[in-house]
Amino acid sequence: MSLQNLKITFHLDGTGLYYDPYEPIHLDALMSWALMPFHRQKGDEAPTRDSVPIDVPLPLGKWHINGHWGWNASALFPEGETGESLQFWRKKFRQNKIEVTQGSPNLQNGIYREYNNPLPLLLTNKMVAYAVGDRGRVHQILRKHIRYLGKKAAYGKGHVLSVDVEIINNDYSILKDGKTMRFLPFSDGIRQVRVRPPYWNNFEKTACAEIGDELSILK
């Protein structure tokens, strides 16, 4: 496997994606999600937050910091002109349907649950990430499996039109201009999170720096 410095560009349809800069999408998480079905057996129980996760092998380089290791893959960032908005996703119980229910409907849980959730909408045509990896394999995985980014894909948000993977001179997978490009272990960090996928899992959580923190000591 030939490892090279890469820039990955996701070209979007411009209708926006639900992107939270405080909980950003990581490139290695997308690739791990895409390949996970090939590493699970039929009938396996669904993983929980506290179960020991599968480390899906990826065609990427690895970093080692403070006794931890992870993949040379950054978070995703918007590139070019952008706009921001806040949309609310609402669901209300239809009062004219109350006669088809038995008893009093539970509006807090279950099928009658009401909600009014704000979601940050990012308007952009491009999302980019950086990695050290095998260009051909990275391109193949992303082109074949990643059709949407972010939440509400079923409603057409975050639609990926195409993916470009180009070779670049510098490694920006973990640091760029002295600032972190992904979650990295840092003893003074306030975020408790895993340093490789799945990031939602609790196993081996550790203190990490926030994306954009200045950590030139890690150069």
Locate the predicted segments by residue.
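RNA-interacting cores
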Residues: 1-219
